[in-house]
Swiss-Prot record:
Keywords: DNA-binding. InterPro entries: DNA_bind_arc (IPR022889), PDCD5-like (IPR002836), PDCD5-like_sf (IPR036883). GO terms for cellular component: cytosol. The lineage of its organism: Archaea, Methanobacteriati, Methanobacteriota, Methanomada group, Methanobacteria. Residues 15-45 are annotated as: Disordered. This is DNA-binding protein Msp_0595.
Amino acid sequence: MSDLDEIRRRRMEQLKQQQLAAQQQQGASLEQMQQEEQARQQFENQKKNALRQILTPEARQRLANLRLTKAELVNAIEMQLIQMAQAKRLQIPVTDATLKQILRETTSNKREIHITRK
C-alpha cells in the first residue's frame, strides 16, 4: 500500500506542477493580450485626435457614415489623410468637398463594365 500511496503522491505533485505551469503561461498570454489591447487603444486615440484636427465636423461625419459600409476603405483613407497632413501636402482643415474629391480619386481606380444589347 505504501508504494501505491507514494505513486499517487508523486502523480498528484506532477499534476499540480503542470497546472501551475499552465496557469503561469495563461497569465503571461493574458498580460500580452492586455498590452496589445492597450497599445491598440492608444493608437486609435492618437488617430482620432489627429483626424479631429485635420477634418471639419462635416467631413468627419461623412467618414463615419461611410465606415458603416466600407470600414477598410475608411481606415485606409484616414491613414492617407494623416500621412498627407504630416507631409504638409494637405490644406488643413479638410472640408467635406475636399474629402469627396479624395474619395472619388481613391475609388475611381475600379473598372467600369458597359454591356450593350443589340
